A protein has these predicted regions:
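Short beta-rich binding modules
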Residues: 1-112
Length: 112
């Protein structure tokens, strides 16, 4: 189902186990709240160093451009459209600008 949603939080952070990730909190027009994200933005190389995943800058930029903002902190308070995949408890990966038909599937960037 396609729903409108307000972005309530937007964070890029290092999880407890050392992985760089992002989380975007939303409140939907259906009355429920959830988070979008949790994908790895980095991993460990052969030498044991944390290095950016090849898609990191691409996915961050795609999210910013889709929502229509220039900075990650500017996401908060913006409205988007989401596709909940019509599956209960399925992660939200498809977002679009509220006024434009420019959908992205965040998961697609992770599979490149």
């Amino acid at each position: 189902m396609i729903l409108n949603a307000k972005i309530t939080s937007a964070d890029i952070f290092i999880e407890d186990h050392g992985v760089l990730t992002f989380m975007i909190g939303i409140e939907t027009s259906a009355g429920w709240s959830t988070n979008i994200g949790g994908f790895y933005l980095d991993w460990t190389d052969k030498e044991g160093n944390r290095v950016p995943a090849p898609y990191t800058s691409t996915v961050v930029r795609a999210i910013l451009e889709t929502v229509g903002v220039r900075g990650w902190s500017d996401l908060v308070g913006k409205y988007i459209r989401i596709d909940d995949n019509d599956i209960y408890n399925s992660p939200i990966t498809k977002i679009a600008n509220l006024m434009k038909d420019n959908w992205i599937n965040i998961r697609d960037f992770m599979e490149e």
